[in-house]
Amino acid sequence: MSPTTTSLRSLSFSLYASSNSTPISTPIEARQLLSSCNRFYGLSSSSSSSSLTTSSLIGNLVFSSRNQSLSVKVQALAAETEQPKWWERKAGPNMIDITSAEQFLNALKDAGDRLVIVDFYGTWCGSCRAMFPKLCKTAKEHPNILFLKVNFDENKSLCKSLNVKVLPYFHFYRGADGQVESFSCSLAKFQKLREAIERHNVGSISNISSSASEKVEDSSE
């Protein structure tokens, strides 16, 4: 037999064997590749699997922690949004928000001889915000006095016509006397507002009792 014939038969047998052999499955190849990598890096399959599991757990914990933190922030923001803004809070029925010049004039007219205190404020005004809780307390102590709140930004034409140039600013009105006093005030000078109330709310029973309580409060401060 010639070498050429032997070579052709060997090639034919090799091709036949190749076409009829069962291919190695992909999972087996993957496992073999992973095993080779582990041997190269000196790791066992179990330690590699353990490392992957630990990494997954840590990743899940971090993701869960971030989700919880985000959830808390969202809940806090929602609670803050639901609460009224500081300027939206009212001390009682004797504190009214003014939204127009017409409403302002009608409120003064309907008050009769009742003392009316107008608070001109801005939502952005830090001094207005600082003294507002004390103003609300004063309104509760004087239910006979009508307090009107005027938002400067929403009633600019009204404020301009009344010559309001600084905030917070107060106007005092009483019956036929009209405007009896006006001044700027702050938390540090809140006593100025109390003294004006004593001057213009003369004869009121609630004024006498509240003045006594204010003196006690001042002596304790």
Swiss-Prot record:
The keyword Magnesium does not apply. One of its GO terms (cellular component) is chloroplast. It is found in: Plastid, Chloroplast stroma. Residues 74-202 form the Thioredoxin domain. GO terms for biological process: detection of redox state; regulation of photosynthesis. Keywords: Chloroplast, Disulfide bond, Electron transport, Plastid, Redox-active center, Transit peptide, Transport. Signal peptide: none annotated. PROSITE patterns: THIOREDOXIN_1, THIOREDOXIN_2. The active site is at residues 125, 128. Disulfide bonds join 125-128. It comes from the Eukaryota. GO terms for molecular function: oxidoreductase activity, acting on a sulfur group of donors, disulfide as acceptor. Residues 1-73 form a transit peptide. The keyword Disulfide bond applies. InterPro entries: Thioredoxin-like_sf, Thioredoxin_CS, Thioredoxin_domain. Belongs to the thioredoxin family. Thiol-disulfide oxidoreductase that may participate in various redox reactions. Possesses insulin disulfide bonds reducing activity. This is Thioredoxin-like 2-1, chloroplastic.
